[in-house]
Amino acid sequence: MELRNIKSFIKVAEFENFSKAAEVLGYAQSTITLQIQQLEQELGVNLF
């Protein structure tokens, strides 16, 4: 489990918006989506 994925999850939850989280973290929106998908696979649950 990557710490950056958890940080991205927290920002998405905070802003309720993948694009805004990506902007704040300095990532592309597609990167945030991939990170959330990785977390979902590791945890075996849908997060959003």
Regions found by a protein language model. Give the residues of each.
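The N-cap/first-turn positions of alpha helices
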Residues: 2-5, 29
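Short, basic/aromatic recognition patches that contact phosphate-bearing ligands
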Residues: 9
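Short helix-boundary/capping micro-motifs
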Residues: 12-26
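Residues in the recognition helix of alpha-helical DNA-binding motifs
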Residues: 35
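A short LG(V/I)-centered, amphipathic sequence patch enriched
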Residues: 40-48
